[in-house]
Design a protein with these regions (language model features):
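Beta-propeller blade termini and top-face loops
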Residues: 1-188
């Protein structure tokens, strides 16, 4: 088991949680948003850096990391301007296809913001759901009966010294029926 702590790195247990060992203390990041174990190879672990919250005290990250050996070593796989990664999903059909939901920078527009997809295990990334310069993707799920169907939640947000501005026209739900290549807005 693994756990990624918002401002406390990555931890691993081999005895059902009785004891935990830090496995990323020697990395350049401390802030994490999500962790995903590849269902095709449990030694392959994907890690999204940057806390998955919108508070003023939030820690930022520097992209997506991959461990091929159960957390012994880590390699940055890109999206260094994402700052806050909220979800990583490995395709149940293909270990080379990975989706990364990125909220992007909290204090400024742009960055690596949206839903990113790789079909070459992180060598290249394509932004497949980009709404606007203030809107990122905060959650993603794959339909368990048809893995070509995905649902994404977007969140338009901006923080300044005085306030957190959340919501707005970019906040919505989206659906894809072609494995994340195209998206349409769900009207609720």
């Amino acid at each position: 088991w693994y756990v990624a702590v918002g401002s406390g790195g990555v931890w691993k247990t081999t005895n059902s949680g009785t004891t935990w060992t830090p496995i990323a203390d020697n990395q350049s990041f401390y802030s994490t948003g999500c962790i995903t174990i590849d269902p095709h190879n449990t030694s392959r672990i994907w890690l999204g850096t940057g806390e998955n919250v919108g508070g003023r005290h939030v820690g930022i990250g520097d992209g997506v990391y991959l461990s091929q050996n159960g957390g012994q070593t880590w390699k940055n796989m890109g999206l260094k301007k994402s700052e806050h990664i909220s979800k990583i999903i490995v395709s149940p059909d293909d270990p080379n296809t990975v989706f990364v939901a990125s909220q992007g920078p909290l204090w400024s527009p742009g960055g690596d913001r949206g839903l990113f997809k790789t079909t070459d295990r992180g060598q290249t990334w394509k932004n497949v759901l980009e709404i606007n310069k203030w809107t990122g993707v905060t959650d993603l799920v794959i339909d368990h009966e048809n893995s070509n169907i995905l649902y994404a939640a977007t969140w338009q947000k901006h923080r300044n010294v005085a306030a957190h501005i959340g919501g707005g026209p970019g906040t919505s739900l989206y659906k894809s029926i072609d494995n994340g290549e195209t998206w349409f807005k769900i009207n609720t």
